[in-house]
């Protein structure tokens, strides 16, 4: 059963404690359903840790989307409807990134997702002296192959949860803000047909995180 974190400061203290006990780089893997607020939470944790002198970097898995051209060749012209599902990511490369983030002592370039071009771009960099990695993404704790290899490279695992009704509205607004839909109602429909389906899969097919933060 997962422990419960009551505040971001509790997560910061937990990361500090782990870092004090681990030689070399620390890697913490964070999962959660789309719209739960993972990125916001881990960025707050990273800012606090960097302020304490622990060089911390947030790395997201969104850059490991298959490019749209490749995705269309894989599943057809309506691939955009399914983008964000587990099979629309290059899982093998995500696993390899998890290994590098934990084990490499060199600078590590990595892809991020450009919302301007709606495709991955190689513009991220983890510097070799980074002490702690916060690797966040929807599917990082799936118990499906090959995703289930990721936890072998994690010093700790965290989950972020949020009320499902809030998640649905946040996702709809996100789709509207990014130009994927033209009305909030269309955003809700897209959330229902894709993001919330993926969220249900995450809940049902992920290993429990060591500690869970309930977002508000």
Enumerate the predicted regions with their spans.
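Extreme N-terminal, non-catalytic leader segments
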Residues: 1-29
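The Walker A (P-loop) glycine that initiates the GxxxxGKT/S ATP-binding motif of P-loop NTPases
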Residues: 32
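Hydrophobic positions on the alpha1 helix immediately C-terminal to the Walker A/P-loop
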Residues: 41
């Amino acid at each position: 059963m997962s422990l419960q974190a009551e505040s971001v400061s509790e997560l910061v203290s937990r990361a500090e404690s782990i870092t004090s006990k681990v030689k070399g780089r620390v890697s913490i893997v964070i999962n959660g359903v789309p719209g739960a607020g993972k990125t916001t939470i881990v960025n707050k944790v990273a800012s606090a840790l960097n302020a304490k002198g622990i060089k911390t970097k947030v790395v997201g898995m969104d850059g490991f989307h298959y490019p749209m051209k490749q995705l269309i060749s894989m599943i057809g012209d309506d691939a955009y409807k399914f983008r964000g599902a587990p099979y629309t990511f290059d899982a093998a490369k995500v696993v390899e990134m998890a290994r590098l983030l934990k084990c490499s002592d060199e600078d590590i370039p990595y892809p991020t997702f450009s919302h301007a071009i709606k495709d991955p771009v190689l513009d991220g960099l983890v510097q070799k002296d980074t002490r702690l990695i916060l690797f966040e993404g929807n599917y990082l704790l799936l118990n499906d192959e090959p995703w289930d290899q990721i936890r072998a490279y994690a010093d700790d695992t965290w989950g972020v949860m949020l009320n499902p009704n809030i998640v649905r509205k946040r996702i709809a607004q996100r789709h509207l803000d990014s130009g994927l839909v033209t009305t909030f109602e269309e955003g809700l429909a897209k959330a229902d047909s894709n993001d919330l389906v993926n969220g249900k899969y995450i809940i049902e097919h992920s290993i429990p995180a060591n500690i869970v933060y309930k977002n508000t």
